[in-house]
Amino acid sequence: MFLRPWSRNFLCSCRGFSVCTPYASIKSASELALKNISELQALQKIQNHTEKLKFFSSKLHNKGEPFTLQLGDLITEHTSVPELNEILDKFSQSNELFTMRFLEKASIIAHKNRSAELARRLRTYAANAMIDLSRVAFVNIFWTLLKTRDKEGIVETIEGQPIAFKVARRIFRRLLVYTSEAGENIEICFFLTNSLFKRLLNNREALSKDEKSELQNLYYDLLLCFSYSYYVPGVKLLLPMLYNGSFKEINRTAIDRSLLALLSTGELEAALELLVYLKNNNIPINDAYLRMMVINFCLANKPTLAVRFCQAWFKQSKMLSSTENLLLIAESLSRASNDFAAISKQMQPFSIESSSFYLPSHRLLMLVALMMKNSSGILHSYAVLKKANAITNKELRIMMQHAMDLRSTEFAEAVLKESEFTLQSNRSQLLMDFVAILFLNKEYTKAFATLEKTFASKIKPSHNIISFSLSLVKRFGTKNDLFFLRRSFKNMGIETLDEIEKNLPPKVVYRCFNY
């Protein structure tokens, strides 16, 4: 090509131009370019918007001369939204005038003025003229709608619009930053994930290796965004993509936060599905999440489901069969029913010898029996555990607590005898429990003797037992009882006795086992 394209419309006027073009055609094209420059300069000299429209219309409807102007020539950086709307109203029937250049310039005005109505009109005119929005026009329209929180407009703009991966990535990146900073637009983020991200995922085979990696990173960033916002619909929308194998690598932070969001909002079914996925893929699960699952079942008054969950998962974590965890379920069971026999029947599938949850279920029943002060239930479960050589210090302290509830020194002595072969540290706790029961039953002489005997065995009384005994003797004992108690403690070297007695509350509670 040997002519210099000095006009922005030169190439448009020379469509089909080739080296074989006749000289007359070349001359005609150059004349059109000169005419376009002349008319454009004339249009730019007009300051009044109405006069500009008149000039443009006169050139448009002049059939005797070729029309060289473009609708975008009417737009300057000073064009207002009402003026642009007037242009659209006047030329709305002429789809051929809506070029990409016009849409780009108009979208800048819409974005600058945050006019969602104008942005939606531009999108509609582009669709009517069958024009795919350029990156500039699309981004301007999209951010205008986003900043004005026009959810429907955003979704309509996305649907049917071919969007390159780089543009989509930029949209999500900026949206994620905007959402995290402002704490808003989480629903718009959800709508875009449901439409645009799904579209990217369905077309991932066409992406390069780096783009696939970026898509995976984007997935986990979206998951984190929804999780930190506790926006459950978003979490539940994204997780199935992980389950069906769309992404091979695991982002533990995103998964943990998702699990926390589901558990915190009581979405037990979705949380359980995620736990099963982690278990099947040999991914370690934090004990805290399993405990939260149990807590949720108990709060929902579904203790049987909590037991079933523990049975299925206790091999994953010893915490599920621990006394602390079983105590939660026991409290839920005792709230649901006052009939221990009915609860025992309910727990029968778990407490039979062939059950994998056999021993933990009897620990559970023992706790329920303790709460209901059912001696036969406690003794039966204790016998089962003893037969299996599964007695721990927790069970002995439960028995001691039951002795305290019954105010039975004989029961406490029997429990103490059972503990003869336990560790010294565990036995010292039980001895203190026994002393507390003696004081509770006003058997002060025996209590003093036991205290001195335990001290001779290098077992020092705890702060709790000192406070408890002082409180009881002060309230129910004689002056002599109080004198002997103080002397016993001083003989044991309790230097802070006066301070403890001075700060003694009106009533001190002692428990062998807290429930």
From Swiss-Prot:
UniProt GO cellular component terms: mitochondrial matrix; mitochondrion
Signal peptide: none
GO biological processes: mitochondrial translational initiation; positive regulation of mitochondrial translational initiation
Any GO MF annotation of the entry: protein-macromolecule adaptor activity
Domain of life of the native organism: Eukaryota
Protein's name according to its UniProt entry: Uncharacterized protein C106.19
Lineage: Eukaryota, Fungi, Dikarya, Ascomycota, Taphrinomycotina
